[in-house]
């Protein structure tokens, strides 16, 4: 993998934004392990220059762990296994944050069931979490104060005025 500044064309992954972000991700991973998560891979900073952190997968995570309850903003994937979709929905919605959810399935009926049930401002289906510029970055609950992208975000700064004009012609 090529970790370097994102402005370099063949980068696979760039750095975190600053030293505080790197420290926060390190601390969250460490605390998750202390709380019982198992480190499957990653979990460490890369090198001594820059703010690079290894892509990290944690398994055996529980709902009470900070890594689940708080937004991490780093390359960390806490994994939880479910056998019943209703349990996964309830578990996902049992959080103070609601920025994004992701669904991976080829079952269209299941897709729409999940979209209706998940309480998140954005849902990505069979793709990574990267919004379209014309979209609306809309976190629910403690994930922001509404959308700020695209036409919908711009409209938040405008005030509508209706004018009705009749002329004798």
List each model region and its residues.
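Short, small-residue-biased leader/transition segments that mark boundaries at the very start
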Residues: 1-8
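Short, conserved active-site loop motifs that form the nucleotide-linked donor/cofactor pocket
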Residues: 4, 37, 76-77
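Short linear capping/connector segments at secondary-structure termini
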Residues: 9-14
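Short beta-strand to alpha-helix junction loop
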Residues: 16-26
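Short secondary-structure junctions
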Residues: 36-45
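Conserved C-terminal structural/oligomerization subdomain of aldehyde/semialdehyde dehydrogenase
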Residues: 45, 52-169
């Amino acid at each position: 993998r090529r970790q370097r500044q994102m402005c370099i064309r063949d980068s696979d992954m760039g750095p975190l934004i600053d030293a505080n972000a790197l420290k926060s991700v390190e601390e969250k991973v460490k605390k998750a392990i202390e709380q019982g998560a198992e480190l499957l891979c990653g979990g460490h900073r890369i090198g001594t220059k820059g703010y690079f952190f290894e892509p990290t997968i944690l398994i055996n995570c529980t709902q009470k762990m900070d890594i689940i309850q708080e937004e991490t903003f780093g390359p960390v994937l806490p994994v939880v296994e479910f056998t019943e979709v209703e349990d996964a929905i309830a578990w996902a919605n049992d959080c103070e944050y609601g920025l994004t959810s992701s669904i991976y399935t080829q079952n269209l009926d299941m897709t729409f069931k999940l979209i209706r049930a998940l309480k998140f401002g954005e849902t990505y289906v069979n793709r990574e979490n990267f919004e379209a510029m014309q979209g609306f970055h809309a976190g629910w609950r403690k994930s922001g104060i509404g959308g700020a992208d695209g036409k919908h975000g711009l409209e938040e700064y405008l005030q509508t005025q209706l004018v009705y004009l009749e002329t004798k012609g």
